[in-house]
């Protein structure tokens, strides 16, 4: 894996990725690819990016030894990469800062975004306020109901939230609408995609901005324990927090990488969002080719997860490629396992995790007891759980 280079010049990671969009979007994506290529080679761009990550986001985010949880489970030592401590409460802002700086560089006055859990919507509204741009956020009507606190946050930050009533009224449909809007207003509008998916150059660009997670973690773990973890684990929906942790570790062959998809009610039921674990075929959605939950006629299937942010039928193309070349293992945590992990982290560490991140914690909860006390699991705690309090209370039958 020392020679891992992806994507190629056409935006493909092996057989995944690429550019599957209508003719009308090609010029916009070409303009974006050219602008990103120029920015990528400009030290001043990265200087501005690092400045905002430090002074605005509050990076570096620490790594934390979850000693009480580790002791309770008996087995491997669990460490957390604390992305929940970033400004706006999740990893999403790493990417929105980068894309907003690029939008500014390109002279765009307006940004649009899609959001599921609302975290990316909040992070996009935040950077729009920070850089003086107008912002429209597209959000499925069902997700709006699930994530009212984040909807209000976006409005407080000056964004306009557009409810999407079509299809399953979730993230997939919000992304469809945002892409339609981008086609119509490409001259003055920059589309901030929130995950490591979409047409090229988005998967590469989002990954590059999120790699700050893994780069920091490598230096921090070396300092904290004198070596790298035995396992690095992250939840995977579209997969931006996971690729940000994994990518810097791809060349470290003694570090096992584990991506945890949303198992929902079980991959043997229709109610999950686990394209890789369920053996979904390759399909095209939102401008890229990847494993995609679909029926025998190629129609995209409905998904289910207790966490709005993992409720997506596809997966970022680089994850599909890393699965194909067997560098990353993909598995699932079911709703009930994620909820149990959520409770355990609250009780033993005083940390309320996002339900998305709880899927990664669930893998650690399940596997730490099978490992030695001298082994180390690094969990990417991708976000905090304030936004999920209503969902968890409802599931427990508690009225707030």
Curated annotation (Swiss-Prot):
Name of a matching Pfam family: PALP
Q: Which cofactor does it need?
A: pyridoxal 5'-phosphate
What name goes with this protein?
Tryptophan synthase beta chain
List the GO biological process terms.
L-tryptophan biosynthetic process
Q: Which InterPro entries match?
A: Trp_synth_b_CS (IPR006653), Trp_synth_beta (IPR006654), Trp_synth_beta/beta-like (IPR023026), TrpB-like_PALP (IPR001926), TrpB-like_PALP_sf (IPR036052)
Gene3D superfamilies per the record?
3.40.50.1100
Question: Keywords in UniProt for this one?
Answer: Amino-acid biosynthesis, Aromatic amino acid biosynthesis, Lyase, Pyridoxal phosphate, Tryptophan biosynthesis
Naming one, the record's GO cellular component terms include: cytoplasm
Q: What's the Enzyme Commission number for this chain?
A: 4.2.1.20
NCBIfam families listed in its UniProt record: trpB
The catalytic activity, as recorded, is: (1S,2R)-1-C-(indol-3-yl)glycerol 3-phosphate + L-serine = D-glyceraldehyde 3-phosphate + L-tryptophan + H2O
Its subunit composition reads:
Tetramer of two alpha and two beta chains.
Residues passing through the membrane, by range? none
General function of this protein:
The beta subunit is responsible for the synthesis of L-tryptophan from indole and L-serine.
Superkingdom, taxonomy of origin? Bacteria
Pathway(s) per entry:
Amino-acid biosynthesis; L-tryptophan biosynthesis; L-tryptophan from chorismate: step 5/5
Which Gene Ontology terms cover its molecular function? Answer: tryptophan synthase activity
Please give the residue positions where the record annotates the modification N6-(pyridoxal phosphate)lysine: 92
Q: Which PROSITE patterns does the record match to this protein? A: TRP_SYNTHASE_BETA
Give the family per the record.
Answer: Belongs to the TrpB family.
What class does this enzyme belong to in the EC scheme?
Answer: lyase
């Amino acid at each position: 894996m020392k020679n891992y280079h992806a994507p190629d010049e056409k935006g493909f990671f092996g057989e995944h990725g690429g550019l599957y969009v209508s003719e009308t979007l090609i010029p916009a994506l070409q303009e974006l690819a050219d602008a990103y290529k120029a920015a990528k080679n400009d030290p001043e761009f990265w200087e501005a990016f690092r400045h905002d990550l430090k002074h605005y986001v509050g990076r570096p985010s620490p790594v934390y030894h979850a000693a009480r949880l580790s002791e309770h489970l008996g087995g491997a030592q669990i460490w957390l990469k604390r992305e929940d401590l970033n400004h706006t409460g999740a990893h999403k802002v790493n990417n929105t800062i980068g894309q907003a700086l690029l939008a500014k560089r390109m002279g765009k006055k307006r940004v649009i975004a899609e959001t599921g859990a609302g975290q990316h919507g909040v992070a996009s509204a935040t950077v729009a306020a920070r850089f003086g741009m107008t912002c429209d956020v597209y959000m499925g009507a069902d997700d709006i109901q699930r994530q009212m606190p984040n909807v209000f946050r976006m409005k407080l930050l000056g964004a306009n939230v557009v409810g999407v009533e079509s299809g399953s009224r979730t993230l997939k449909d919000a992304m469809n609408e945002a892409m339609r809007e981008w086609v119509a207003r490409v001259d003055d509008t920059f589309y901030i995609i929130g995950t490591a998916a979409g047409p090229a150059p988005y998967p590469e660009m989002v990954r590059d901005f999120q790699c700050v997670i893994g780069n920091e973690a490598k230096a921090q773990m070396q300092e904290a324990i004198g070596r790298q973890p035995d396992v690095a684990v992250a939840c995977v929906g579209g997969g931006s927090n996971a690729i940000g942790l994994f990518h810097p570790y791809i060349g470290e062959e003694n570090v096992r990488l584990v991506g945890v998809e949303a198992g929902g009610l079980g991959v043997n039921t229709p109610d999950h969002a686990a394209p890789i674990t369920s053996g979904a075929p390759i399909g095209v959605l939102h401008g890229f080719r990847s494993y995609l939950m679909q029926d025998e006629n190629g129609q995209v299937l409905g998904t289910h997860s207790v966490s709005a942010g993992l409720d997506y039928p596809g997966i970022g193309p680089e994850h599909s490629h890393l699965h194909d070349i067997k560098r990353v293992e993909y598995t699932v945590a079911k709703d009930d396992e994620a909820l149990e992990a959520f409770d355990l982290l609250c009780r033993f560490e005083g940390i309320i995790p996002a339900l998305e991140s709880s899927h990664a914690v669930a893998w650690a909860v399940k596997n730490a007891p099978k490992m030695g006390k001298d082994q180390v699991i690094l969990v990417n705690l991708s976000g905090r759980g304030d936004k999920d309090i209503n969902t968890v209370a409802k599931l427990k039958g508690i009225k707030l």
